[in-house]
């Protein structure tokens, strides 16, 4: 009898522990045994802000987390850390976490620990991305350089087309992959010095994400790209059986326009849910001097893009999260306090697409707007060392896509969406 009671206790304890982690059941997110629909944001600089070194400001971190939590935002998408030497290129986020392969900045690691500790206290969860196809945090270009590639270009010097053509080498560079896998092993086997929990046992982490907008960068590289994603997801699963895994893909735009590629990378048995990103200005749906006039086209293209991906999510029975979307401020201004009329209209439309689908039992279960600027006070149009971090990384104008604490009309709309999503219980 005692043995039976012991086994029952163990089973119940295991089920309770599992329920603490965000899970996917029948194409939906579940958190603590309840359906989880959410409005989150991108807080890429969270680990830097939480650090005790350069760039760290824990007083501001607490204010930002408290403000977000008060609004009902409980899902933050965060960069684990930037890669590379400091002071090499103006467009890269500093300070970096991985200075050279296997050489780490303990201050940023401490910051990541502290961020998760503070998020845990507020019952928030994090989506942590490990790589980046773009130069602003190192990523592909960092690993290629340390795998022996010479004269690795930056978009600022060579232009984006030459940069992307060069980055296509990453998909087939096995040495670069091995350097990245070493990094994955290091991060996923870490123990948080503030909570004493191993990362793999911490429910504050919702998902490990392979990268920020991973791309093949050429149609010829797609097979190798897909193979790399599969190997990475399998590695993550071998190290961590508790957490969700996601790709971080933009969708069709990140798959060289190939929806079959998107379906294959989402169908991977180790990938738990699907992602899309939406960038009307970056994708030439909206022109900087005609933002208002191009709003209707941006909304129409957004709906078509989402619908196309939802078909695949329905087929795979996996949830969809739009984990990045943004729109410039009116008249392409950047300064604090400048109007956000057109942005607000775009946000309102995007939010309606998410909630309308979720309320009908669809697979569209959440979104993270880009990005949280909060209480930042940018000093320069382009970020310089010592400036506040905001939603726009260092390669972009500060304020371009940031939502600041003073953007009341936008934040009110976010709160309305939070309330609407929180009422969905199926």
What annotation goes with each model-predicted range?
Residues 4-13:
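Sec-dependent N-terminal signal peptides
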Residues 21-288, 292-320, 325-425:
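Active-site mouth of glycoside hydrolases
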Residues 17-19:
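Boundary at the C-terminal end of the N-terminal hydrophobic targeting segment
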């Amino acid at each position: 009898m005692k043995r039976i009671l012991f086994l029952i206790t163990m089973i119940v304890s295991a089920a309770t522990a599992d329920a603490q982690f965000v899970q996917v059941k029948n194409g939906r997110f579940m958190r603590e045994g309840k359906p989880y629909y959410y409005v989150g944001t991108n807080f890429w600089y969270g680990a830097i802000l939480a650090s005790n070194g350069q760039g760290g400001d824990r007083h501001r971190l607490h204010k930002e987390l408290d403000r977000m939590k008060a609004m009902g935002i409980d899902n933050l998408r965060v960069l684990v850390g930037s890669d590379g030497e400091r002071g090499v290129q103006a467009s890269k986020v500093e300070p970096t976490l991985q200075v050279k392969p296997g050489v780490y900045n303990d201050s940023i690691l401490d910051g990541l620990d502290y961020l998760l500790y503070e998020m845990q206290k507020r019952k928030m969860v994090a989506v942590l991305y490990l790589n980046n196809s773009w130069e602003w945090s190192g990523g592909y270009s960092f690993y290629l350089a340390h795998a022996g590639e010479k004269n690795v270009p930056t978009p600022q010097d060579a232009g984006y087309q030459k940069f992307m053509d060069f980055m296509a080498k990453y998909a087939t560079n096995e040495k670069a992959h091995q350097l990245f896998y070493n990094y994955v092993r290091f991060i996923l086997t870490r123990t948080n010095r503030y909570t004493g929990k191993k990362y793999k046992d911490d429910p504050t982490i919702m998902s490990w994400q392979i990268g920020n907008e991973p791309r093949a960068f050429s149609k010829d590289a797609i097979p190798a790209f897909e193979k790399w994603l599969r190997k990475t997801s399998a590695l993550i699963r071998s190290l961590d059986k508790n957490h969700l895994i996601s790709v971080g893909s933009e969708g069709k735009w990140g798959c060289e326009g190939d929806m079959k590629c998107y379906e294959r990378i989402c169908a991977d048995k180790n990938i738990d849910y699907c992602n899309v990103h939406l960038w009307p200005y970056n994708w030439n749906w909206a022109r900087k001097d005609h933002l208002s006039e191009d709003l209707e086209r941006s909304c129409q293209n957004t709906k078509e893009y989402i619908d196309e991906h939802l078909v695949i999510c329905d087929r795979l029975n996996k949830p969809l999260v739009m984990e990045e979307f943004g729109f410039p401020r009116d008249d392409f201004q950047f300064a604090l306090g400048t109007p956000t009329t057109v942005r607000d209209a775009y946000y309102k439309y995007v939010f309606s697409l998410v909630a309308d689908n979720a309320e009908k039992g669809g697979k569209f279960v959440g979104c993270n707007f880009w990005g949280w600027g909060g209480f930042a006070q940018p000093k320069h149009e382009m970020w310089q060392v010592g400036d506040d971090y905001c939603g726009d990384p260092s390669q972009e104008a500060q304020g371009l896509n940031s939502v600041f604490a003073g953007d009341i009309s936008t934040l009110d709309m976010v709160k309305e969406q939070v309330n609407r999503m929180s009422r969905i219980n199926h």
